[in-house]
């Protein structure tokens, strides 16, 4: 934690600086959302190591997967438009030869798209974790599988949560399957 964060904690709690730092480490941590990490092209192992090396606790991991489009085409844009709902923002990270371009929502990514760049898109749209692909799109499930392998051999946390809040805004064709 930064010196400023430690000082503020000490000021607001009346604790010494060393007590405030210990309290921050004991009570604050990061909820690692695997969909967000994968959309950002982060490797789960590297993200976990970076947090642990910084002394930041990971009290909860959200088990989730997003959409992955390895080389976006005009046809892909037509197929993904039904996922562009008005309820949630679906951040997009596009990987091009220049690096990573970030868009707050699908509409911004549609407007910026250039087929000649052959970008890979990762879209923060939670999809069923048991699917390797959805409607011809790949998913970020491989990142989830990497994390679960690590979790089996060296547990990161005891609190795993499957995050599925976008189930109701999935295109209707993908909401009908029972998972039980």
For the regions a language model picked out, list residue spans one by one:
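Flexible, acidic glycine-rich loops studded with aromatic residues
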Residues: 57, 104-180
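Acidic/histidine-rich catalytic cores of soluble enzymes
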Residues: 1-119, 127
